Amino acid sequence: MSSGVDRDTVISWSEQAQTTLQEAKKMCTRAQASLQSTTYQLVTQLPERLQFVTFMVDALKQQHELLTSIVESQSRIRKESVSQFNVQVERDLTPALAELDDILARLAKAKVPSYLINNVVHELEVHIDTLVEDRNLCDFISMDDIKLLTTNIEIYKANCTKLHGLLEKTMNESVIEPYQIIALKKYHNIMKQYKELMPVQLGMNLAPDVSPYKLNNLINTILKENSSLEHELVPMLEMMTNHYDQCVQGTLFFNTKNPKDPSGDVNFEVLRNDALELPDVLKELNTVYDIIVNNEVRTKKLLSSEFSRIDSLISMIKDLLEFYTDYKATHLSKYMILVLSCDEIFGKCSIAMNSNQTPLEAYIETITSLSYHYTQFLSIYKSEYLTELFYEQYTYPRKYLAKLTDFLNNDMFHLQQEEYERRKNWLARYGEFIPNEFKLPGELNQPSIIQVVTEGLDDVQKDYNDGKFNESAEEINLSDLIKTMKL
């Protein structure tokens, strides 16, 4: 049915439909490209960039944790080393040295009279105290060696104190300060920006099964709107295509006027209405296209800002990772080389020590052993040596001499007298019966003591007169010395 529509009108509609369809197709092509570009940027490009940022942040965290562990470990070791050294010095070494000084002072006060010395020859009693100047117990120990030992200890202690100070200063200046002022500060700044970038600004946590448009309102809005607009393009383009097809059928109708042609069923009234609506449809399509393009512009603007932040953050991370590498290669290496050099000095000792000992422990053990030895030396000198010397030099010799005198004057005398009487009686009884040519028993020499030779009794024998012992000046001096030591 032509419904009063002539051939020229249909041709005009057909030309209009063709032009509009061509323009719509171009517009849809551009719109589709814009949709794909926007979707790629939001769904693929942005997550990839954020994933790379997260990868870089994870690498930074790993390096930062490693560096923090090293710095904290070295700082703790340094503090423990200084503390242990100071504790050992204050708790063990200083008291040990004080104890040694005390016992040496006590040894210096313990006098040793000249008559106690082996190489002193006493020519006259009156000169006993003047032959050799009295000494003290310190004269009989190696004070030079002790002084050398204590001097070496003081040198070692001073060197260790200086080295600990140097290590602490180097630790603070070369390790801790660069770590805290540069590394830690930059790290916290990066993590702050990362947190602002991810959950606050973009609202994304990069979970593998979560798309970004589900997490961010703006991105979600753009993607949902584009999805809806894409669906609107299809029916509008289909309407224009269908309208153009109908116009072509209408043109064929007038050209052939074949009743059997299916175009004979063309509804020119509908065709007229579609032709009238076509500008509005094109306008609506153009509006949809403008929105799609505008969304692409909005997306580029959004991502331009975010990509700039992401690139800046990545650059900061790379710089900090590079600083970490340089920090470990220079600051930490310099400090560790110094530690090794100092440890070598810490391990040097002027005396022999066990493999499981430190020089400080060896010094403390040696000083303690010396103090114990000299304490025993002083104690034995006062309480044992002088008493034993007096006993062996005077008490026991007197006892021995008294026993010997008593034995000679009593037991031996009676024994000799009894033997003499026995022999005399025997000769009187039996001698006349023995020929003179025989040796008579009574004529044999009777055993007798002609001379008694003793040793070790000189100190008491010279003062033994008329069966009594007299105290010599030496004995009196030694006795007085013993009494003095017991006070």
Swiss-Prot record:
Membrane topology summary: Peripheral membrane protein
GO cellular component terms given for this protein: Atg1/ULK1 kinase complex; phagophore assembly site membrane
Any one GO BP annotation for this protein: autophagosome assembly
Keyword Cytoplasm part of the UniProt annotation: yes
Subcellular location: Cytoplasm; Preautophagosomal structure membrane
Source domain of life: Eukaryota
Pfam families xref list: ATG17_like
Keyword Cytoplasm: yes
One GO MF term attached to the UniProt entry: protein kinase activator activity
InterPro entries: Atg17 (IPR007240), ATG17-like_dom (IPR045326)
Keywords for this protein: Autophagy, Cytoplasm, Membrane
PANTHER family reported for this sequence: AUTOPHAGY-RELATED PROTEIN 17
Family of this protein: Belongs to the ATG17 family.
Described purpose of this protein according to its UniProt entry: Autophagy-specific protein that functions in response to autophagy-inducing signals as a scaffold to recruit other ATG proteins to organize pre-autophagosomal structure (PAS) formation. Modulates the timing and magnitude of the autophagy response, such as the size of the sequestering vesicles. Plays particularly a role in pexophagy and nucleophagy.
Protein name in the entry: Autophagy-related protein 17
